[in-house]
Amino acid sequence: MRLNTLSPAEGAKHSAKRLGRGIGSGLGKTGGRGHKGQKSRTGGGVRRGFEGGQMPLYRRLPKFGFTSMKSAVTAEVRLNELTKVEGNVVTLETLKAANILTKDIQFAKVILAGEVKSAVTIRGLRVTKGAKAAIEAAGGSIEE
């Protein structure tokens, strides 16, 4: 077997539909577009959300709420990720150094997911009740 003899498995590749190549092909003349109408023309079609002139759904419904930009710079940290941090003090900077958080994250919260194996000190991070109990049970502490 050589590189120039390789070929895909039988039936793995389908031949492309060749439109407008005669009556016998079954896709000649109109090429599967039917007769006349906007969708049969070149560049024909309607934009997303267009409902034929009827007031579209996205304009019938009222505006509400907004997306907080704080959510883009906030992250959750699982308990089992704390073991990747060097040393036993966990801060925002040490989490970034361990590649657990990206550099643009400004706020983080430790959540109860997984388990903490060693005693760690959490400094300057928010912690859920369950995570706090698990950290303290492992001999760790939380500093504000």
UniProtKB/Swiss-Prot annotation:
Residues 1-53 are annotated as: Disordered. Pfam families: Ribosomal_L27A. Residues 21-31 have a biased composition (Gly residues). This is Large ribosomal subunit protein uL15. The keyword rRNA-binding applies. Part of the 50S ribosomal subunit. One of its GO terms (biological process) is translation. GO terms for cellular component: cytosolic large ribosomal subunit. PANTHER family: 50S RIBOSOMAL PROTEIN L15, LARGE RIBOSOMAL SUBUNIT PROTEIN UL15M. Gene3D superfamilies: 3.100.10.10. Keywords: Ribonucleoprotein, Ribosomal protein, RNA-binding, rRNA-binding. Binds to the 23S rRNA. Belongs to the universal ribosomal protein uL15 family. PROSITE patterns: RIBOSOMAL_L15. GO terms for molecular function: rRNA binding; structural constituent of ribosome. The keyword Cytoplasm does not apply.
